[in-house]
Amino acid sequence: MARKVVVVDDEKPIADILEFNLKKEGYDVYCAYDGNDAVDLIYEEEPDIVLLDIMLPGRDGMEVCREVRKKYEMPIIMLTAKDSEIDKVLGLELGADDYVTKPFSTRELIARVKANLRRHYSQPAQEVSGATNEITIKDIVIYPDAYSIKKRGEDIELTHREFELFHYLSKHMGQVMTREHLLQTVWGYDYFGDVRTVDVTIRRLREKIEDDPSHPEYIVTRRGVGYFLQQHD
């Protein structure tokens, strides 16, 4: 069965180009041209991935992303004409998985679509190299097979990408990982984003798992190098 893609862009020529090229790749494509219709379309079609413009009439892309994340975990790639770190970072903090700045290469965007779909929907047994055992880190228990984490017995709601990042760090406890390395291994080798994506995802993780995110005891920064998961006896 073909993967479903929802394209949301108020510039119809751009949406048409994306629809044409994505259909050539074998995807089922549905388009919306404003924020309100986008939410309705996503709820109706329940796509496998969403390409979401930031600047939209009605609800903007940020509002749409926030609304969709209340119910769904499919990858969301933000499309922005504003070459602004604020927009990019805010989009990721709301739960977007990736972003592309206009003008963009259709070939690059399709590569990102494939990378996000592959990473999000690949089988857990493959992604964790057959690991089935629980991983305990102080008060946190990771359940690889269930793609879930608990802290002091309480479930921690993580996105797919957040889980992958935390689980990867847990398999390399105490080892400092550069942002570039994490982009390659967690986001995929053909990921075209910048290292700021890692920083934002780390910040989201800390807000969910740390007692005091400003003084983390699990995910530690090695300034100028990267991140590592602190060992606990």
Curated annotation (Swiss-Prot):
Q: Which SUPFAM superfamilies match?
A: C-terminal effector domain of the bipartite response regulators, CheY-like
Q: Which CDD domains does this entry report, sorted A to Z? A: REC_OmpR_YycF-like, trans_reg_C
Using the UniProt record, give the first listed, main subcellular location. Answer: cytoplasm
Q: Does the keyword Disulfide bond apply?
A: no
Q: Coiled-coil region(s) at which residues?
A: none
Bilayer-crossing regions: none
* DNA-binding region (UniProt annotation): 132-231
PROSITE patterns registered for this protein in UniProt? OMPR_PHOB (PS51755), RESPONSE_REGULATORY (PS50110)
Q: Where does it localize?
A: Cytoplasm
GO MF terms listed in the record are: phosphorelay response regulator activity; transcription cis-regulatory region binding
Its BP terms in the Gene Ontology are: regulation of DNA-templated transcription
4-aspartylphosphate modifications at:
D53
The UniProt keywords, alphabetically, are: Activator, Cytoplasm, DNA-binding, Phosphoprotein, Transcription, Transcription regulation, Two-component regulatory system
Q: Which Gene3D superfamilies match?
A: 3.40.50.2300, 6.10.250.690, Winged helix-like DNA-binding domain superfamily/Winged helix DNA-binding domain
The keyword Membrane appears for this protein: no
Processing and modification events after translation? Phosphorylated by WalK.
A Gene Ontology term for the protein's cellular component: cytosol
Domain Response regulatory, by residue range, is 4-117
PANTHER family found in the cross-reference section: PHOSPHATE REGULON TRANSCRIPTIONAL REGULATORY PROTEIN PHOB (PTHR48111:SF40), REGULATOR OF RPOS (PTHR48111)
Q: What does this protein do?
A: Member of the two-component regulatory system WalK/WalR.
Q: What is this protein called?
A: Transcriptional regulatory protein WalR
Which gene is the coding source of this polypeptide chain? walR
